[in-house]
Amino acid sequence: MVLRMMSSIQARLARAVLVSLIAGAGVVRAQEAPERFAGYRSGFHRDILELQVLLDRKNLSCNCIDGIWGARTEIALQTWQLLNGLPATGIPDAAFLEALGRGPPVLTRYTVTEEDAAALGPFPDDWEERSKLPALRYVTLQEMLAEKGHLSQRALQRLNPDAAWPNPPVGTEIVLPDCSHDKLPQAGSIRITLGRTEIAAYNAAGDLVALFPCSIARDKSRRPDGALAVRTVAPNPNYTYDPQLFAPGGENTVKLIIPPGPNNPVGLAWIGLSLPGYGIHGTPIPENIGRAESKGCFRLANWNAVKLLQMVETGTPILVEE
């Protein structure tokens, strides 16, 4: 029953388009929307960035917030419109803007601390050298702060053009999105749609409560299909490097334990599936999410992987479909 409801919802979502909007100081009047979003489909647009933040707060992710209109932002916005009983027109209208309502400012200021600078670390090219480290930390403050704001590193630069990237000195004030959100809902089930490279979470009533872009296996034969379930959840996991997975038939057969951290191959969260060796996990390169490039698992941006890990539990059902 729940899975049938989910299919209906996703069928509706697949037929929609996009728009723009923003809250922060308050509700924008409908007649202001066209002027405010003039040229929003071309290049970096600050109001699109703010729209992406608002959707991210609702767990409807475009992946990396970047201020650029694209298919992922369109899907997230259409989803929000449908979930709130609005036509998925892709046009900022009175009903849409009024429904979003008021909230805290979309952008906030963050000051770089000594602790931030001390939390950086190296990232060797060699797997064996990586295995000897205590953790695979962020390499630059730019990388760290971009993930903190759910941003692409390029968008972080655009918001802060005068900062000394990639490592602004301690005391530098940085503008970041405020991606704070309400308590995460419990997921009653998960649906992974391969054709749309997305992971959707539903509550026990079958209502969609989160939508995250994901990466899937490059090799179609390695893509799971059908009913699965969550078997394990591990925040900040380590990773077992198997050289045979990367170079089948090669001489190297020595497995290595790669320490945890944001630049670990599975990022900051691991959700193990009932299919041995498969999981949903984070990634050190969030900008690449949405591609068919994994070895078989499902990748999410670290911030979305952490969210999903907090929403599921052992036994949560998962359906993988085309």
Task: Go through each PLM region and give its residues.
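Bacterial N-terminal signal peptides that target proteins for export
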Residues: V2-V17
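Bacterial N-terminal signal peptides
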Residues: R15-A25
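Sec/Tat signal peptide C-region and signal peptidase I cleavage site
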Residues: G26-A30
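Primarily a LysM-type cell-wall glycan-binding module
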Residues: R41-I75, E115-H150
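Sec-exported extracytoplasmic/periplasmic mature domains
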Residues: V53-L60, Q78-L86, L97, G101-P105, ...
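Extracellular LysM carbohydrate-binding repeats and other cell-envelope/extracellular binding modules
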Residues: A71-A117, L159-S189
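Gly/Pro-biased beta-strand-loop elements
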Residues: S180-T283
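Exported/periplasmic cell-wall-interacting domains
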Residues: G250-E322
